[in-house]
């Protein structure tokens, strides 16, 4: 890309060339080496040790969707970080929760946020929720080379569909394959345990308060059986990140709200360590 000439004050030609409304396409055309998936890694032997984010969960309710994540990052058998943030707003009506290689995942989220903002500025309107999910799918697919070297990124995407007036959840695989989930979803190392908990507790008529409690219950169950997932840490005042997306937009629960939910669950678990029980019939 040509450097901006200070004497004339002109923008580089790349900025004046007509193209698509995708910022990723712009980078791909003019500076592809800046895209995460285009970087060449040196040859390595064995698995690359890097911090990994673990468990993300999401659940819908009649007014929207809740997306939440634990706070632990691991590196092999070690705890790399106890208070990592894994849930981020993508734009006003959507959010992304990251699992997989933490550094690459955070970089991908930042690029995704920029992609959505760039599209809105160029087109004068937001992408549909389906369109946002497709853009994220393309970004994950571009990371396939890294994934083949053990640096996979597997996010969970959720948002409020203003056209359909409901919350929706999209999951992905390492190749960028996209699936829309019904009711609830989980990704990451503790996802199998979180999904099992949500399967027994989910109802179509959940209130927002019930939905936020459900995701923390699911993360607690995941932490109970998966060492890479962190449960509520009362001593350090570290609690799951819980976000809610409705017709009013994205909102992250305050630390006080999250701690209140977590503490109420911990108190109940003193009597029922395995959590709430679903009816047999």
From Swiss-Prot:
It comes from Streptomyces scabiei (strain 87.22). It is found in: Cytoplasm. The gene is prcB. SUPFAM superfamilies: N-terminal nucleophile aminohydrolases (Ntn hydrolases). The keyword Transcription regulation does not apply. It is an enzyme of class 3 (hydrolase). The lineage of its organism: Bacteria, Bacillati, Actinomycetota, Actinomycetes, Kitasatosporales. This is Proteasome subunit beta. One of its GO terms (biological process) is proteasomal protein catabolic process. HAMAP family: Proteasome_B_B.
